[in-house]
């Protein structure tokens, strides 16, 4: 698979552990691709849920995917500041169809005022039983929650204002070409 270039549009597909398609984002603009990471932006992007419902993202959001870490990060740029939605998920896989990952239910939300919340713990525990998450997988995901919280607490990567500003500025430049 040829890596997408800056300005290319890709589809993102989220799956569940049992292989079922969970959610699809159409036309995410790629801002940067490296050997291990993809940075993109969603802005009024069409999202299709597994039940067929469709909606459009409201604000620009910088998205970060990595091949090493078991999470992805969405930095939502809002009038009152940047909020984050972080999915505990498999490292991404890229093929000719889409960027793909498995969503493991647990989410960390960071509000513009810095408040953090771990979400969907009950859903995670339910799916862990239903879909037979292994003990090794459970350990990996819980360790990655710790890594993610460390990134948040230390303003690392996508949790840095400078990071969000640089990539949003680049998006505006590309959009207006």
Curated annotation (Swiss-Prot):
Superkingdom to which the source organism belongs: Bacteria
Residues that coordinate or bind Mg(2+) 2: 105, 107, 120, 123
Record keywords: Hydrolase, Magnesium, Metal-binding
Residues involved in Mg(2+) 1 binding: 87, 103, 107
Coiled-coil parts of chain: none
The keyword Magnesium appears for this protein: yes
Catalytic residue positions: 23 (proton donor)
GO molecular function, one term: nucleoside diphosphate phosphatase activity
Cofactor dependence: Mg(2+)
InterPro entries listed in its UniProt record: DUF402 (IPR007295), FomD-like_sf (IPR035930), Ntdp-like (IPR050212), SA1684 (IPR016882)
EC number(s) reported in the record: 3.6.1.15, 3.6.1.6
Catalysed reactions listed for this entry: a ribonucleoside 5'-triphosphate + H2O = a ribonucleoside 5'-diphosphate + phosphate + H(+); a ribonucleoside 5'-diphosphate + H2O = a ribonucleoside 5'-phosphate + phosphate + H(+)
Pfam family, one: DUF402
NCBIfam families (UniProt xref): PRK13662.1 (NF010183)
Family recorded in the similarity comment: Belongs to the Ntdp family.
Function per UniProt: Has nucleoside phosphatase activity towards nucleoside triphosphates and nucleoside diphosphates.
Protein name: Nucleoside triphosphate/diphosphate phosphatase
């Amino acid at each position: 698979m040829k890596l997408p270039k800056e300005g290319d549009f890709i589809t993102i597909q989220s799956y569940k552990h049992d292989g079922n398609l969970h959610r699809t984002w159409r036309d995410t603009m790629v801002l940067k691709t490296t050997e291990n990471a993809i940075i993109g932006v969603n802005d009024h992007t069409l999202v299709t849920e597994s039940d067929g419902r469709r909606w459009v993202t409201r604000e620009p959001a910088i998205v970060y995917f990595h091949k090493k870490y078991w999470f992805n990060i969405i930095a939502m740029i809002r009038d009152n500041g940047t909020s984050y939605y972080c999915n505990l998920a498999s490292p991404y896989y890229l093929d000719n169809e889409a960027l793909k990952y498995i969503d493991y239910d647990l989410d960390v939300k960071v509000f513009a005022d810095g408040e953090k919340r771990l979400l969907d713990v009950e859903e995670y525990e339910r799916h862990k039983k239903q879909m037979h998450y292994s003990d090794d997988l459970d350990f990996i995901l819980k360790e990655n929650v710790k890594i993610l919280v460390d990134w948040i607490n230390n303003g690392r990567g996508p949790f840095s204002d400078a990071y969000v500003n640089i990539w949003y500025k680049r998006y505006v430049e590309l959009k207006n070409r």
